[in-house]
Curated annotation (Swiss-Prot):
Molecular-function GO term, any one: DNA binding
SUPFAM superfamilies assigned: YebC-like
Upper classification of the organism: Bacteria, Bacillati, Bacillota, Bacilli, Bacillales
Any one Gene Ontology BP term: regulation of DNA-templated transcription
Originating species: Bacillus anthracis
Family: Belongs to the TACO1 family. YeeN subfamily.
InterPro entries (UniProt xref): Integrase-like_N, TACO1_YebC-like_2nd/3rd_dom, TACO1_YebC_N, Transcrip_reg_TACO1-like, Transcrip_reg_TACO1-like_dom3, Transcrip_reg_TACO1_YeeN, YebC-like
Protein name, UniProt field: Probable transcriptional regulatory protein BA_0541/GBAA_0541/BAS0510
One Pfam family it belongs to: Transcrip_reg
Length: 239
């Protein structure tokens, strides 16, 4: 399965503390999902996924409503969903997902973030085959056995169910995201600590200390780009 979710979460915590950055990225993602389909999450699964994710980051209702209303209002602002793949120091593998209204700008910015930090862009497919698209659902107040029983009774498949720190984390196929959540909600779960569609590395690598410092600098540079929504990688950043 690669890194446990909490290992990823802990390293993201300091970056995610930048709430204005997080809210801006969610605002854009909600707008795009609402514009591409119905602005109603009941009939728009992509929008429902984004809104469930937003809940776990405590995105204010005002941010959500503003993005949905913008989509309803027929805004002509369009974004392309683009994925870039590349390598960091010591051949570390990186995937960068973006939403952009200026492809040339985004490509140049992403390329610069790689090249200025001992990395380089790769071609499409150069690293993605080493990652698995995964739904990650986290909750508290249940044991892994209880969650397994709930999902089995609801006839919902999961790849893995692990107890990580004080939470239970369910790893499933992306198309099982809503099914997992629905089964748990029906069983009385009201809040989720994690609700993500992510790319998990099949195998992790450990970098020498100097290379890891350079790698973390590169990831920070990528995540700070306005058009970047998510950065995935295969580096075990340790404690």
């Amino acid at each position: 399965m690669g890194r446990k979710w909490n290992n990823i979460k802990d390293k993201k915590a300091s970056k995610d503390a930048n709430t204005s950055r997080i809210y801006a990225k969610f605002g854009r993602e909600i707008y795009v999902a609402a514009k591409q389909g119905e602005p109603d999450p009941e009939s728009n699964q992509a929008l429902r996924v984004v809104l469930e994710r937003a809940k776990t980051y405590n995105v204010p209702r005002t941010i959500i409503d503003r993005a949905v209303e913008k989509a309803k209002g027929g805004s002509e602002e369009n974004y392309d969903e683009l994925r870039y793949e590349g390598f960091g120091p010591n051949g570390a593998m990186v995937i960068v997902d973006t939403l952009t209204n200026n492809v040339n700008r985004t490509a140049a910015d992403v390329r610069a973030a790689f090249s200025k930090n001992s990395g380089n862009m790769g071609v499409n497919g150069s690293v993605a085959y080493m990652f698995d698209a995964t739904a990650v659902i986290g909750l508290e107040g249940k044991t892994s056995d209880e969650v397994l029983e709930i999902l089995m009774e609801a006839d919902v498949d999961a790849r893995d169910i692990l107890e990580e720190e004080d939470a239970v984390i369910v790893y499933a196929e992306p198309d099982q995201f809503h099914a997992v959540q629905s089964a748990l909600k029906d069983a009385g779960v009201e809040e989720f600590t994690v609700a993500e569609l992510t790319m998990l590395a099949q195998n992790d690598v450990t970098l020498p200390e100097d290379a890891q410092a350079q790698f973390e600098k590169m990831v920070d540079a990528l995540e700070d780009l306005e058009d970047v929504q998510q950065v995935y990688h295969n580096v075990d950043l340790g404690e």
